[in-house]
Amino acid sequence: MNQWVSVDLFAGAGGASTGLRCAGLEHAVCVEWDEDAAKSLKAAGFPAVHGDVRDLSHYEDIERVDLLWASPPCQAFSTAGERKGALDERNGWPWTLDIIDHLQSRGIGPRYVMCENVPGLTYHKADCTGDVEQCPGCYWEGWIIPEFKKRFDWVGHMMLDAADYGVPQHRRRIFLVAGEGPVKWPSPTHGPPNIALQGTMFGSPVKPWKTIRDALGMEKFIGGGRNPTPRENDKRTYRDITNEPSTTVAAVTIGNAGPFVAQPGSEPWRLDKPSPAVTCRDDKGARHQKFDPSKTPMTAADATWRAAGVRRLTWRECAKLQAFPDDYPFEGRTKKSLYRQVGNAVCPPIAEILGRMIIDALEQ
């Protein structure tokens, strides 16, 4: 049996690394700039390097790379920010390609590359003029994809929602794969309860979405008004509106972002659905409103879990919505750091599924 070797760039606290390890890949190195996140990586047993991914000395002892995973900083492209795109100083795509060139020049791979980023990377600006330096969508179509096609025989990409693969959170991300040949993208394993039922009856079965209640066990927050326990004639209403995953966990630490959980006596949120986009901020704001799950959540302030009477989810609760193991050894000197690490992470189950997909391609 082959031992497949991976390199993790912009590794954060280890979400992708954890998933890839579960899939059966062995890490040669995991590089992360943030000191606390690098400590978390090391505590979790990964070969962590605290440093700049552009420092090529980090890769000198590597003899083979089967998969290079990269999660370049998303702030340059997120719809929650200014979307400076290619000109943003945090744009890590050129750095990723430089590392690929370095490894290929030594003849050690990578055989496949997996890159993860926010959907906003693929969206065109309203005032788009076709300039790849000014419009993220043009940068994606006119520079990123062509640059990978120069280096690999096959390039593909797909948007995935973590909730469709067993994570109790709606977290949409674009995944780019480049390598020796096509991959077979994973089919969803979970879906809305009605789709799950139809699938069982008429096609490939999927399980119902995992929910906030599944992850956090918050039965006591179903109550409404001043009474934390709904009246008998309210039970159907509250049951019917409580079926949803969380929204995306993000990593900003200012403003009035959630996620929040209703305090006893407050109006309930949809606990029996996947969480909305959970923003990992230390909440200091005063504006709280109910999140409208019918709207597409953004990564920052709009992508929150809010209610009339609220408390901020703890960073450990956020980690549960990211589907980290309960005992994952996050290291951090401040709550701000811990929230940021959790919110920046790739959901481990998604990385595991995609890691298995890459292994299947490697074994062809």
Language-model features and meaning:
Residues F46-D52:
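Conserved SAM-binding strand-loop segment of SAM-dependent methyltransferases
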Residues V31-D34, E116-N117:
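Conserved acidic E/D residue at the C-terminus of a beta-strand in Rossmann-like folds
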Residues H27-A28:
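Short beta-strand element of Class I
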Residues L41:
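Conserved SAM-binding loop
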Residues L9-A13:
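Class I SAM-dependent methyltransferase "Motif I" SAM/SAH-binding loop
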Residues A351:
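Acidic-aromatic/histidine active-site loop/patch
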